Regions:
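ATP/NTP phosphate-donor binding region
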Residues: 1-88
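Fold-independent oxyanion-binding glycine-rich loops
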Residues: 19, 42-43, 93-95, 116-119, ...
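Short glycine/serine/threonine-rich phosphate/pyrophosphate-binding segments
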Residues: 22, 46-49, 97-104, 123-126, ...
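Short, glycine/charged-enriched secondary-structure capping and boundary segments
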Residues: 52-56, 79, 105-108, 128-131
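A short, small-residue-rich loop immediately preceding and capping a beta-strand
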Residues: 83-105, 109-118
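A glycine/threonine-rich phosphate-anchoring loop and its flanking beta-alpha core
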Residues: 108-201
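Active-site segments that bind and position negatively charged phosphate/pyrophosphate groups
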Residues: 191-255
Length: 255
């Protein structure tokens, strides 16, 4: 029997993708815990999410951090110092680079991580990894964390209102996962079953995107929140991340 040990981390512990998803924060955290939250966000991201933010964002004691840097060691150290002591949860609001930084900060502080994606350009909200950069903004490597993200809160209307170029980027990135997986695992029958499940998921997601993208893009142009649009967004964020989670190094390159 061939031995190809892999680690499977399928996805976050909780994933909510529907209007009003932010309300689920209170299903898992008390007001006292949320008053000790660290919210980290980008300038455009927090503006995009502003009308959807839950009351927990304004609780006394909450730490708000506007971040403009990279997921670098120096930036994460600075954020950890700025966060202070006795924090309960890290909540990241933004795109892939911001969420990678917030994920790294949460692990540095030993806290659960909640992702609030404001664009659908990558599966960063789903995946338990961060891409690290140096201070000049050059990518160095990625780190897979020992635990899954605790929660993803996806508010579809925020994604609907984002520039369409981000959705197009996510569609292209996610379509590529099927083709990359075929190259990385040319003999899937010799690999663990979960790798094959990941490849099957990549194919299913590819089909969703090929069938629904045209309608989803038109719906976004018309500012209509439809099933086709939500399917494409979930295919990018949840589906794309799940492919890497199931197949590890055999499907991870696109995650």
């Amino acid at each position: 029997m061939p031995h190809n040990p892999i680690r499977v981390v399928v996805g976050p512990a909780n994933y909510f993708s529907h209007p009003g998803s932010f309300n689920h924060l209170h299903d898992f955290f008390t007001d006292e815990q949320l008053s000790r939250a660290v919210w980290i966000y980008g300038e455009r991201a927090i503006a995009a999410a502003q009308t959807k933010l839950p009351p927990a964002f304004e609780l006394p004691g909450v730490k708000h951090i506007l971040f403009r840097g990279h997921c670098s060691e120096s930036d994460v150290q600075q954020l950890a110092a700025e966060s202070g002591d006795d924090r309960s949860v890290v909540i990241g609001v933004g795109g892939g680079a911001l969420l990678d930084t917030a994920k790294a900060l949460a692990r540095r502080l030993g806290l659960p991580f909640v992702a609030v994606p404001t664009i659908a350009a990558t599966c960063a909200a789903w995946t338990p990894l961060s891409v690290w950069y140096n201070d000049a903004g050059q990518a160095l490597h990625y780190e897979i964390f020992d635990d899954a993200n605790f929660m993803v809160l996806l508010e579809p209307e925020i994604i609907l209102n984002a520039p369409q170029e981000y959705l197009l980027a996510g569609i292209g990135d996610t379509l590529a996962k099927w083709y990359e997986a075929v190259v990385l695992a040319p003999q899937p029958e010799t690999l663990p079953l979960t790798v094959r499940l990941g490849i099957n998921n990549a194919q299913a997601i590819r089909d969703v995107l090929l069938n629904s993208t045209e309608q989803a893009l038109a719906d976004q142009q018309n500012q209509q929140l439809t099933q086709s649009f939500c399917d494409v967004v979930d295919a990018i964020i949840a589906g794309g991340g799940m492919v890497g989670g199931l197949g590890d190094r055999f499907t991870r390159v696109a995650a």
